[in-house]
Swiss-Prot record:
EC annotation from Swiss-Prot or TrEMBL: 3.5.3.8
Cofactor section: Mn(2+)
Chain sites annotated for binding Mn(2+) 1: H127, D163, D167, D254
Protein name as it appears in the record: Formimidoylglutamase
Pathway terms, separated by semicolons: Amino-acid degradation; L-histidine degradation into L-glutamate; L-glutamate from N-formimidoyl-L-glutamate (hydrolase route): step 1/1
Matching Gene3D superfamilies: Ureohydrolase domain
Keywords of this entry: Histidine metabolism, Hydrolase, Manganese, Metal-binding
Entry's cofactor comment: Binds 2 manganese ions per subunit.
Organism name: Paraburkholderia xenovorans (strain LB400)
Classification via NCBIfam families: hutG
Single Gene Ontology BP annotation: putrescine biosynthetic process from arginine, via agmatine
Record: residues binding Mn(2+) 2: D163, H165, D254, D256
């Protein structure tokens, strides 16, 4: 089910009377519709209100409430002077257990945003959001291309996932742990490379079977212990090489990649995790590449959060992607 733009969630304090630019993000938000074209590469928020994939994956539900809560926190951040406007395309809601239909609807919305000149930033929801986001990018490519095969083969898509988990489970029906296996199968069917890089992998959160599957698929991965602050220069160089070899980038951030003290509001908190400063620096590098086409932020669970700490972290990362 699609829920339209809600301007009431975009609200915050007013500093009228103070000198200088006192605007906040909520002052920059406008509604997005399929008939609307935005400034080229302008960010467009899309909500994916779903935790059905988390439920199927035996996780702790609550992430369906995340999109609205993240908007509330994002609304109060300082306006970005370089950003003319921020559009909001509303939410796709999965409230009937039909995850597959919700993912297909999300794909339609993502495709609409791309067709309108925008750059979708999808706020999940569980990490099942990834299949919907990716499908929307592929759908847009299909609709735009006169020759789909030529377009898909000639343009190299890099998928970057900041995550403690591979999310390469092969069990069906699909859930929050299967999206990148679904993507790998889709790439194989299309005859295009599966270029998947996963940063922040925990050796204690993935079975030997998952590591073996990742090896078979040629996944580029880095352990969480190798993504601490002293190793940031090395990781940035590694990331830059991946970016240089790509034409388009899909970035997905699972908040459980962060330490539990930083992001307590997730279904599976990390015992070690990757420092926020490292994730943020790498996100900024991706953003600066000029190749980012779509992005999403997944697994925020407001019902498990403490003092909105995780919400503030997620909003900070979203802000860097605007």
């Amino acid at each position: 089910m699609r829920v339209p733009f809600n301007d009431k969630v975009w609200a915050g304090r007013s500093d009228d009377g103070e000198a200088g630019d006192t605007r906040r993000v909520f002052n920059q938000v406008t509604p997005f519709g399929s008939a609307v074209r935005v400034q080229h590469d302008a960010p467009v928020i899309v909500g994916f209100s779903s935790d059905e994939g988390v439920r199927r994956n035996q996780g702790r539900i609550g992430a369906a409430h995340a999109p609205m809560e993240l908007r509330r926190v994002l609304a109060g951040l300082p306006a970005k002077t370089a950003m003319v406007a921020l559009a909001d395309a509303g939410d796709v809601v999965c409230d009937d257990g039909d995850l597959e239909a919700a993912q297909a609807e999300l794909a339609d919305v993502v495709s609409e945003v791309l067709a309108g000149g925008g750059r979708p930033l999808v706020l999940g929801g569980g990490h099942e959001v990834a299949w919907g986001t990716y499908s929307g990018l592929r759908l847009h490519q299909q609709r735009e291309a006169e020759n789909e095969a030529t377009l898909l083969i000639s343009r190299k898509l890099l998928i970057i996932n900041f995550d403690a988990h591979f999310d390469l489970r092969q069990k069906r029906p699909a859930n929050s742990g299967t999206p990148f296996d679904q993507i790998a199968l889709d790439c194989a069917e299309r005859g295009v490379p599966f270029n998947y890089a996963c940063f922040g992998i925990s050796d204690l959160s993935n079975t030997a079977s998952l590591f073996a599957h990742a090896e078979r698929l040629g996944v580029h991965y880095v352990f969480d212990v190798d993504m601490q602050e002293t190793q940031l220069p090395q990781r940035l160089n590694e990331l830059q090489k991946l970016l240089d070899a790509a034409d388009d980038v899909y970035l997905t951030i699972d908040l459980d990649v962060l330490p539990a003290a930083t992001a307590p509001g997730v279904s599976a908190p990390a015992a070690l995790g990757v420092p926020l400063s490292v994730i943020e620096a790498m996100v900024l590098r991706v953003r600066a590449s000029g190749k980012l086409r779509v992005a999403d932020i997944a697994e925020y669970n407001p019902t498990l959060d403490q003092d909105r700490r995780t919400a503030r972290v997620a909003a900070r990362l979203a802000y860097r992607l605007l």
